[in-house]
Structures are given as C-alpha cells and as structure tokens.
Amino acid sequence: MSLLASFFRNPWGRPRWLAVVTTIYIVWSIIPVSIAILFAFNASRSRSNFTGLSLRWFNGATGSAFHDDALRHALLHSLELAALSVVVATPLGLFLALGLQRWRGRGAGLTNLLMLLPLVTPEIVMGVALLLLFISVFGFIGLGTTAQAIGQITFSLSYVVVIVRGRLVSIGKDYEEAAADLGAPPFDALRRVLLPLLGPAIVASAAIVFATSLDDFVITQYLSNGPDTQTVPMLLYSVSRGAPTPALNAVATIALVITIGTLVAAFLVYRRFSSSGGEAATEIATLDL
C-alpha cells in the first residue's frame, strides 16, 4: 500500500518499484533467447548440456545450418518473403496513407475501418480466410510463394498505413501549403518536401514489415504448398518436435541477427531523417518555381 500511496502522492516521480518490475520483465524475456543462442555454439549435439564453444553448427559439420539443404532453403525463403513484403507493402501503404489522409468524402470512415481490420483480426482467422480465397476464388494462383507473399503483404499493409498516417498528422499541412503558395506543382511538393519528412515513418514501417514477415508462422503455414515453401518458423516448429540438433538454434540465431541488424539500421536511418527535418524548409525555399 505504501508503494501505491507514494505513487499517487507524486505520480510524476521516479518509482523504484517500476524499475524493478521492468528489469525483471526484460531479464525474463532475454533468458530463453540467450539460452537458444548459446546452444547454437555448442560443440556437441546436445541441446541441454553445453560442452564448449564451436561454430560447427553454422558451417562446419554435416547437418549444419549452411550444409543442410532444408535449413538453408528455409532461411533463404524467409528472406525472400520478407524482401517481397517490404518492397510491395511499404510503397503501397505509403500511397494508401496519403490517399486516406486526404479523403473526406462518403465512405472514408468505412474505408479507414477496413484498413485497420487486419490489425484486430486474429491471425488464424486471416490465414483460414486467405486459404479459402486462394483455393476457391484465385485457384489460378495456387498455394506457394506467391500466395504467401500476398498473405503477408495483406497482413502487414495496415502497419505501414497506421505509422505513415501518424506521421502525416504530426507534420500537418503547413509545408505542403507553403510549397503550393510558392507555385510548386503537387508532385514536386510531394517529392521534395513531404517524402523527406515522411522518411522516419517509411523506414520504421519497412523495418516492422520485414520483422513481421520473417517471424510470421500462421499465414505462411496455411498458404504453403509443401517443403519447398517452408520458412524458418515453420521448420523450427516441425523439426523441434522430433530430434532437433543445435543447427536449428544456429538458423534461429542467424534470423535473429538479421532482424536485429535490420532494426538497428532502420533506427540509424530514422535518426538521420529526424535530425534533418529542418531541411524541408530549405527545400521549400529552393524550389525551382
């Protein structure tokens, strides 16, 4: 009770108990991942008894991550789907966000609701719905890589729209109106003023789409047509119930490093865009009118 009383007496203070709870949560979240990464470097096949450091499960022994065709193919297929999702969902979500932000006519509210629907729909419902769609309506596409890419893009598109629209709201209309007042064509105002200001949101959206695609299991599983379209999460799920080796840990570690590297790179680019936000005014002043 004393903790709650002190919190309500000074809600803007620095509650020590909150720092303790946060630390416990972070440690609890990191421990399983750290153990999985540790056994990727195990010298033996055991996944419960650590015998020494080794890189054999990455590229040094038969059955290692880069020697096992199934593991290597799953990793490459995951990266392929993630790249396709980023390349398609990011620009498409950007233009949808721009359109929805400017749409004030009839049906705008319903369209906004439909755009947010994938965020609140259970992923298993989305997976089953897409499976039935590709079987009964779009049978000419069939299950496989194309269907998986479309499914992931459908699911992740809403993230891009929400993030970009949030940035559009914070930017406001002042920069565009200033460029228009100076006689800049709409396309020039978009290309030289608005898009640089949207840079942080675009980069953040692309990073989230990439991470979401790389981690997706349910939709990718439903739209798969066999071993050739297995991703890392699908392979980890199927093999971990049998007699897995630390090579699985190695593949998971590689995927984790790629994801973290992508997020770090996106953060650095985000900071670069954020620090150069004032350049929009300079662009307006130097527009070729």
Regions found by a protein language model. Give the residues of each.
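Membrane-interfacial helix termini and adjacent extracytoplasmic/periplasmic loops
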Residues: 4-8, 55, 107, 124-156, ...
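Hydrophobic positions within alpha-helical transmembrane segments of bacterial inner-membrane proteins
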Residues: 33, 82, 86-94, 98, ...
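C-terminal transmembrane helix and the adjacent membrane-cytosol boundary/short C-terminal tail
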Residues: 2-6, 12, 17-20, 107, ...
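A structural signal for multi-pass alpha-helical bundles of membrane permease subunits
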Residues: 30-45, 77, 127-139, 207-213, ...
